[in-house]
Structures are given as structure tokens and as C-alpha cells.
A protein has these predicted regions:
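Extended, solvent-exposed, turn-rich assembly/linker loops in the middle of proteins
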Residues: 138-220
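N-terminal "assembly arms/tails" that initiate or stabilize quaternary assembly
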Residues: 1-88
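Short, solvent-exposed loop/turn elements at domain surfaces
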Residues: 63-67, 186-187, 237
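A generic structural signal for short beta-strands and their flanking turns/coil linkers
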Residues: 50-52, 173, 223
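Long, contiguous amphipathic alpha-helices that act as assembly "spine/axial" helices in icosahedral shell
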Residues: 56, 81-143, 167-181, 294-309
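Residues at the C-termini of beta-strands that transition into short coil/loop
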Residues: 60, 181, 231
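Sequence/fold signature of self-assembling virion shell proteins
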Residues: 2-40, 105, 153-156, 190-330
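Residue-level detector of secondary-structure boundary/capping sites
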Residues: 47, 109, 146-149, 153, ...
């Protein structure tokens, strides 16, 4: 008997009902930046009904006095002096709205997904505000690298400059570094004498080599700097000559200030080790008929609002340094 192909197939124009698509109700994962800058800054708060400007002060350190006091003579009183630093908070806000019909027919939990996406925007906003404050002093805190790419020597040089200016490390007795993954690659590939490869012969490199395995999400410590990675770093230049900022931060470098009860509200992401908050806790408001929307055409709103500022706390002795390094990978 002669071979006869199937008459009915999925591409047959006679069977249009087969031309259907199954739509997954679960959104695919997003590529998101990790937020590191708020974590290395110093937190503070303005109480409500106390204005929107905060002022800090510090006493100027006195020098030594090696002159012996003359016997029987009352000396001269030493005057004390202070300096002040001020910062003014600003409002940041965004919202997204969903129609009632979209809320009724969407195949996904559309309000929840809108809230999650807007929350990431809020978290990225805070991280970038703090990073921009770090970058604003680049001309005063920049340290030249020994070569085009970052090395352990460069990190050690930043630590030496900071300690040479009497800048203390952070509370864990280490300076904190924020670094792009491309720069981490170059540091790990540093095979010069005293470089990463050489140092790891005598150290326990497991945390650094295994990536963000530490409980605090860091890449490990090298050259006196405990490092966290993120792609949300400052850059300069254009491809293929982009320079990536590497931040080495001591205690009291940059402050972050919120208005009491109206500051950023982080949601810690358990999927990200050491996460300081990858999203915001946004407000979700269900719609319905109201004087502004008598017909109830708006089904829901998601929004955030926070009052915040980042400020360099010491512009006489900057308490951090920035390296600008090319990346061998790109």
C-alpha cells in the first residue's frame, strides 16, 4: 500500500484551534545588581519635626606639648576648636499603577510582580545615591594603579595611604572594599612577587577562590581589604577602555542619613548571601471607586517614598581611597 502522510498536523490551516500557546505563569529570573554601598557607610537618623538638615561636629585633635611647665607658674589655657559637617535630606519616590481589568485578567500575580520590580528600583536608587557621594571626591581620593589592571599591590597601597593618614579600619578591624567582578579576576590572576597567587601559597584561600561563600557575602580578604563584589561601581571612559572604580573604605568615611520613619526600608533577600537588602518594602494600595477614580478603573498602586541623603563625613582627611583600573577581560 502506498505511503500517505498525515492529513492533520499542528501546522494545518484547517485546524486553527491547534495554533495555541501555553503561557507560563511564573516569571523568569532577572539579572540584578547587588547593593554594597549602603553597608559600608555610617548610618544616622534625623528625628521627626527636627528639620531636614543634620549637622555633625568633631573636635580638632590637639598636637603634643613637649615644653616642660615652668615651676610655680600658671600656664596658658589651650583653646579648643570644632568643625561641622551638614547634610540636607531629600525625598525620593516612584509608583506604578495597574488597571482593574489588567488585575482581573492577568495570568501572573501582577500586583506582586510590579511591587517586586519597583522595590528593586528603590534599592538600586539608594545604593547609587551613596556610591555617587563616594565618587564625588574622586579627584581627592584617587590612587594610581601600578599597571593597567588591579593587583594586590594596589590594594596594599590604598591601605598604606589610609593608615598613613591615621584612618582606622572598620569595626571588624579590616578595611572594606567594593570591587567589580572584572577587577576581582585581575587580582586573582596577579602572579607577581607578593601578588595574589604568591600570597595564597601561604594562606588559606578557600573563601576567596570559591567566590561569595563567606557568611557576610564577601569575596574574602587580601592585602588588608575585605572585598564585596558588585557591578554597580563608578566607571569612566568608553569601551574598550573603561576604567572601573575600586573602593577601599575605612571607618567614618561616608554617612547615610534618613528621616525617622521615612527612611529606606530594606527587604533582605535570603537567596543572596550577606545581602544588605536587594529590594525595598514597597506600599501596595488596592484601588476601587473613590473621588479621584469614581469608576474604579485603577485596580491597584505600588509605590515607595523615602527621605535620605549621603554625605562625606571628613573632607579634611578623606577616609577612603578609589582605584581606577582597566579590566583584562573586556
Amino acid at each position: 500500500m502506498a505511503y500517505a502522510p498525515a492529513v492533520s498536523t499542528t501546522t494545518s490551516p484547517l485546524l486553527p484551534h491547534l495554533n495555541v500557546t501555553y503561557y507560563s505563569r511564573k516569571a523568569l529570573s532577572q539579572v540584578k545588581k547587588q547593593f554594597r554601598f549602603a553597608a559600608v557607610s555610617e548610618p544616622d537618623e534625623i528625628p521627626r519635626r527636627s528639620g531636614k538638615t543634620v549637622q555633625w561636629y568633631r573636635y580638632l585633635a590637639l598636637g603634643s606639648n613637649i615644653t616642660p611647665a615652668p615651676e610655680g607658674t600658671v600656664g596658658v589655657a589651650i583653646p579648643q576648636q570644632t568643625s561641622t559637617v551638614t547634610a540636607t535630606v531629600s525625598e525620593y519616590a516612584d509608583f506604578s499603577s495597574i488597571s482593574t481589568l489588567a488585575d482581573e485578567v492577568a495570568i501572573d500575580p501582577i500586583t506582586t510582580n510590579h511591587a517586586t520590580n519597583l522595590g528593586y528600583r528603590g534599592g538600586l536608587t539608594v545604593d547609587t545615591i551613596v556610591r555617587t557621594e563616594f565618587d564625588s571626591n574622586l579627584s581627592s581620593v584617587s590612587v594610581a594603579t601600578a599597571g593597567p589592571y588591579a593587583t594586590v599591590f594596589d590594594l596594599k597601597k590604598c591601605v598604606a595611604f589610609l593608615r598613613g593618614a591615621d584612618v582606622l579600619p572598620k569595626e571588624d578591624n579590616e578595611f572594606h572594599g567594593i570591587i567589580h567582578p572584572y577587577a576581582v579576576f585581575d587580582i586573582q590572576a596577579d602572579n607577581t612577587a607578593g601578588g595574589f597567587v604568591d600570597v595564597m601559597k601561604w594562606a588559606k584561600p578557600s573563601v576567596f577562590l570559591e567566590g561569595q561563600a563567606a557568611a557576610d557575602g564577601s569575596m574574602g580578604e587580601v592585602g588588608g581589604v575585605r572585598m564585596w563584589t558588585t557591578t554597580n561601581v563608578g566607571t569612566s571612559g568608553t569601551a574598550p577602555n573603561v576604567l572601573y572604580n575600586i573602593y577601599v573604605v575605612g571607618a567614618g568615611a561616608v554617612g547615610r542619613v534618613a528621616l525617622q520613619g521615612s527612611g529606606p526600608n530594606y527587604v533582605v533577600d535570603p537567596a543572596v548571601v550577606g545581602s544588605p537588602g536587594e529590594e525595598f518594602n514597597v506600599k501596595v494600595v488596592r484601588g476601587g471607586p473613590n473621588p479621584a477614580d469614581p469608576e474604579g478603573m485603577i485596580g491597584s498602586f505600588v509605590s515607595y517614598r523615602f527621605v535620605f541623603v549621603a554625605k562625606t563625613l571628613d573632607s579634611t582627611t578623606f577616609r577612603y581611597r578609589i582605584l581606577q583600573a582597566d579590566a583584562s577581560l573586556v
